[in-house]
């Protein structure tokens, strides 16, 4: 079964808005064994939209259309579908009442133009929108289906999960099913990653692919099978081999948030953490504090950008700074011990490094030291992060959280 996705909205064409729908729908449909054969982005003009829809109907079994379901005159998706299929637009009373209730819950009266959102091509299956005022729809024609979804990502994704998945699962002959496992790595470049697992690549099914973001290399293992169990088995077998070879660089898997994992591990262990940061400027503490309830384990942090702050606030000995420099193993350890002592936490985590764009004290750009202090002792690691300033800082944050995770795991 093949699908085509049409993204509507002039804001997408001119680059004002990032098209996150492409990634989400492409991934979800592929996982369900539906082959996505084409993406098309079209502006808010019904003539072009109609032409694109006609072409898609010739190629694909399923046509997904996102956006253009609002109450304004340039929201033309449903009207275009009706025009192309020569269908009348009909008012859905249940949708109209749901839209009225949406406004009433906010102490507002529904504007008259929102009535437009309750009209659908005749015979359409209405998809309720639990997070907005724009219901979606499924229109079936000649053994094909046009699936109309709202533009805002949070509305579209919720509607897909709540209504579209069950519809797609009811369709026969979806083809092979697909699943994947993703590993997120830091402190290593893409080429080195490939060298370490080169003999595992090129199998075809399952296959390994790579994606590089600032400070992160993603390794994805993807498998296909006649059943989800078969595909999952293929992925699990290869993933275990990948995990063993790359363990020291893996900081997260799939959609896992390492800061959330570390936080829960601290809670389970009854421990607290404090952070001393130089080159990351508070990014580690920000990641940890982004999780609700972080006050249960995060004591606080110190941004020690200068030698003076490292010495006065964290108690880094002046002779350590003079002999080894601000970017050194010795300074990182002293920072970790100092922040644990001064803030009274169970664990002290510290980073110091050269984020660039120029070297410092003769130390190269990308050189970073990370240290962790606990009642049982200290551990540290030296990194040479590739890339620009943003990538180095991002990699440092992930590596520091990985060190905390491995410590809490006892590894």
From Swiss-Prot:
SUPFAM superfamilies: CinA-like, Molybdenum cofactor biosynthesis proteins. InterPro entries: CinA, CinA-like_C, CinA_C, CinA_KH, Competence-induced_CinA, MoaB/Mog-like_dom_sf, MoaB/Mog_dom. CDD domains: cinA. PANTHER family: NICOTINAMIDE-NUCLEOTIDE AMIDOHYDROLASE PNCC, NMN AMIDOHYDROLASE-LIKE PROTEIN YFAY. Belongs to the CinA family. HAMAP family: CinA_B (MF_00226_B). This is Putative competence-damage inducible protein. It comes from Desulforamulus reducens (strain ATCC BAA-1160 / DSM 100696 / MI-1).
